[in-house]
Each structure stands twice: as C-alpha cells, then as structure tokens.
Curated annotation (Swiss-Prot):
The gene is rplJ. One of its GO terms (cellular component) is large ribosomal subunit. One of its GO terms (molecular function) is structural constituent of ribosome. InterPro entries: Ribosomal_uL10, Ribosomal_uL10-like_sf, Ribosomal_uL10_bac, Ribosomal_uL10_bac_type, Ribosomal_uL10_CS_bac. This is Large ribosomal subunit protein uL10. It comes from Actinobacillus pleuropneumoniae serotype 5b (strain L20).
C-alpha cells in the first residue's frame, strides 16, 4: 500500500520524536523471522521500555537527520527494523542480541550510543544503573575489607616482633 505525503510526514515525525528522547538505537534486519516471533519480540520490547519500528529507509534517513543517530544511515539498507532504548542504553541491544541467538534469521546491522556507531555486543553488556551501583559498592566493600586485613596483619607482625 502506497503512503501519501501526510502519512510519510507522520512516520518521520514519530520516529524523530522517539530518536530525540532515546539513549541508544539498534538496527536489525528481520527477514525470515515469523510473525509469531516478531510479536513476541515487540511484547518484550514494550516491557523493556524499547520503541521498535519497521520503517522505509528513505523515511528513516529523514527521521534521524539532526539527531545523534544520524551516524547509522549507512546501515539503512534492505528491510530495516530500528529500536530506541529510552530507559537504559543497553536495553535494545540486550533484547536484540538475545533474540538473534534464538533466531538465526535475525541479523543485527549496527548500534549507536552518544552519537557514535558502537558494537551491539558492547551495548548489550553495559550494566544497568542498579548493576553499576552494586558493582561499585562491592568494590568499595572489598577495598575496605582488604585494608582491614592488611592493618590487622601489620599489627600482628608488630606484636610478634615485640615479643
């Protein structure tokens, strides 16, 4: 079905709005994936706070113009599925990576974060805010415990020398 000018403008505006509020974007090719599997992916995307859309490449190029995802225009070839992460930069990458492992037909084309093309695997392994805080706290606790052990060992050695 051919789209009229107003429909095209609405699509460009919608995708542009999603791009402006997004932290990262991931581009994929979903040829060969069944409708049932794509429906599952869309449901998972909604739960993860990810906006997903299949858009014509020419409209997508116009939609990302002037945004930090303009660097992805080289990946807009063939059927293009784009996902924008709104809550966590790695959400879309993690979702697509897991889906690609289960569905060999699903091909990841690229990802962008902070205006630069990034490896999808890199984005998928980014810790969430809570995970990063937990790692930081673990490191701080570990450092404090290590310092205590070294202090006690030094005190023990000093007492042994005095005796």
């Amino acid at each position: 079905m051919a789209l009229n000018l107003q429909d095209k403008q609405a699509i460009v505006a919608e995708v542009n709005e999603a791009a402006k509020g997004a932290l990262s974007a991931v581009v994929a090719d979903s040829r060969g994936v069944t409708v049932e599997k794509m429906t599952e992916l869309r449901k998972s995307a909604r739960e993860a706070g990810v906006t997903m859309r299949v858009v014509r490449n020419t409209l997508l190029r116009r939609a990302v113009e002037g945004t930090e995802f303009e660097c992805l225009t080289d990946t807009f070839t063939g059927p293009t599925l784009i996902a924008f992460s709104h809550e966590h930069p790695g959400a879309a990458a993690r979702l697509f990576t897991e889906f690609a492992k289960a569905n060999k037909e699903f091909e990841l084309k690229g990802a962008a974060f902070e205006g630069k093309v990034q490896d999808v695997e890199f984005l998928a392994t980014l810790p969430t805010y809570e995970e990063a805080i937990a790692r930081l706290m673990g490191t701080m606790k570990e450092a404090a415990a290590g310092k205590l052990v070294r202090t006690l060992a030094a005190l023990r050695d000093k007492l042994q020398e005095a005796a």
